[in-house]
Structures are given as C-alpha cells and as structure tokens.
Amino acid sequence: MALKLPRAMIEDMIAHAREDLPNEACGVILGKDGVAQALHRARNAEASPYRYVIHPEDLLRFHRLVDEKDWQFLVIYHSHVASEAYPSPTDVRMSLWPGTNPPIDAYPDAHYVLVSLANRDRPVVRAFRITGGVVTEEALEAV
C-alpha cells in the first residue's frame, strides 16, 4: 500500500533539506489512521552532513503532541546531502532500540522518508519501512 502524503508536505521536506545544507535535515509527520495531519521540522542534534539525530527536546515535544491529539508517528524523515535516497546502515541501526536482541523497532508503525540532494536541482524523495533491520521500499504518492 502506498504512503500518501500531501504534495505540500513533500515540498516542505525538500525545502527543509535545502535549508539545512550542508547538514542533514530531519523531522516527523504526525497523523491518525494513516492520514498525515502535521509536519514538524526538527533540529539535527548531530549537526552533521553524514548523520542525523532528532534533538531530544524536539522529540519530547513530538511525543507530547502524539499523546495530546491521539496521533501516531506516521513518518520520520531526513535528508542525504550527497548520497541516494536509501537508508544507510547507520539509518537502519538508528531505527532500532539500542542493545535489543532480537532487534526491537523504535517506531514500528512509522514510514521512513528520505530526501536525497545528491542532485541539487532534482531532489529524490523515497519512502521505506524498516522492520527488524530489514529495509523495504514503499510507493510514495503525492495527494
């Protein structure tokens, strides 16, 4: 089943990725029953072109919104500044709770969306599920 996101949210993720250059950008889309409700940009606590970590204060704010509005983490997004829109080994590792064996997904219901700016004029946006460390691409549909 395709991940359906408003075109404006896809454009906002691309804009965010460009604005945060030279570092990776990150954020979330919160929603209910698979329907996107709100995109929230986050600060990259790593401030790195090679890695992202959603700033803990931002993550806490997102969890509070999820609780207050009875939403879910629909999308966790980030950018790759010079590589393809595909989860890196670090991205896969970061999708899991540390030290769990077998692996436990940190956000089992979330889609992972990557924005590649490898070609600055033609950004690429792709969606994935990461389950137990296994990456599966999903169709992404702008609505």
Set out the residue ranges of the language-model regions.
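Conserved, mostly hydrophobic/aromatic
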Residues: 76
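Metallo-beta-lactamase
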Residues: 79
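Conserved beta-strand-loop surface patch within small alpha/beta domains used
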Residues: 1-73, 82-143
